[in-house]
């Protein structure tokens, strides 16, 4: 049995309860999420529908003109399967208006801009519906820094941030995510033909095995190499995790007082509750 195997029924109950507790305790009843047509957002959509009722979940597909038409088709498929409220908001006019001033911008800049435009749409709809924005980044992406700061990494709550990609696949089977979404190659769909694993240079299953030992089991480099991982791979992943730490925390605040936010003023739960 793989170390990454999870009790999907138990984790399902935990995450449904998490969404209910965190959303209801602030007086909200609804949730908003971006539905890309990929497996991560599909899983969050199904969990939110189960936790809040599909009528209280607003899923928004936000295509750009180069987006694969299959992505929107799969987003619709997930919305139909989960029964949530679904809408499409194109981001082409907003993105192109900006890059008309910077026509030589590379794919990375354009992809980050798209992610941040989608973030603004989601938080605007959060205000419209009075719901919290749900994050859809998994643990693998968060550890590698494979996401856009204040873009797809921005949310009020993230129910799948402690699930490796391998575990996202497992739980998606449990909750009933449509097969075409589970079986397709992971892609952020930021430019034509882009796939996550080709861009990263390794498969999610390979890196998940390494990350689990490195992070969850705290294995050092010598132990990881002894377990069969190549030294170059271990060093590369360690660097990615280390260099992307700024994406996983609040902005660093210069300390000038007796109690500084995220330094001395830190609480595991809401202050005073």
Swiss-Prot record:
Keywords: ATP-binding, Ligase, Magnesium, Metal-binding, NAD, Nucleotide-binding. GO terms for biological process: NAD biosynthetic process. It comes from the Bacteria. ATP binds at residues 34-41, 136, 165, 187. The keyword Heme does not apply. It catalyses: deamido-NAD(+) + NH4(+) + ATP = AMP + diphosphate + NAD(+) + H(+). Mg(2+) binds at residues 40, 141. Its EC number is 6.3.1.5. GO terms for cellular component: cytoplasm. Deamido-NAD(+) binds at residue 116. It is an enzyme of class 6 (ligase). Catalyzes the ATP-dependent amidation of deamido-NAD to form NAD. Uses ammonia as a nitrogen source. This is NH(3)-dependent NAD(+) synthetase.
